[in-house]
Amino acid sequence: MLRIIATFFKKTDRRRWADPRNIYASWESRNKELAALVPSNSRVIEFGAGKRTLERYLDPSCSYVPSDIVDRGPGTIVFDLNQRPLPDLGPDAYDVAVFSGVLEYVRDVPAVLDWLTKYVTVCVLTYAPAKAKGPSPRGLLETIGRLRHGWMNNYREEELRSLFCERGFELVQEKDWEEQRLFVFSRR
């Protein structure tokens, strides 16, 4: 219940993500699939690095920087995607941003994408899209379920694609991973 209330008020659950028991081993296979979608020789920044399993599966030619709301070890850039202002990541430091099950927890996805366009040309991500269309009893139940997870938004697949396309990205690849979709977007 506390998670629903915090999510309703759009608060990042820092305590939850500081507890390593809330970073599940089953997510490693998702990160392995995401790493396979990252082009070789990429300079990668991962948002929501967790246990940093993505780093293990990236092509050795890639460089990697973790970021998260809590410290995840050496080199971690610590900040919250729900706090403003978002940090300056420096000019020409990264090519690829990876979001593994993170965008659901972001309050203002359009603002984060606007910020991100200054820093990367490729986004590799997973997202658990909303299924219900428009206001309905089913939509209300789905929203409650998403709040229980701590998710702060309810984008359907086509809405998420549009958010990226409106910012100059084009969809390069997408596929299923369990109940989520894996996407690769590249700037035109």
Model-derived regions, located:
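A short, conserved alpha-helix within the catalytic core of class I
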Residues: 105-119
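Conserved beta-strand signature within the Rossmann-like core of class I S-adenosyl-L-methionine
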Residues: 120-131
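Acceptor-substrate binding/catalytic loop of class I
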Residues: 139-159
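Core SAM-dependent methyltransferase catalytic element
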Residues: 172-188
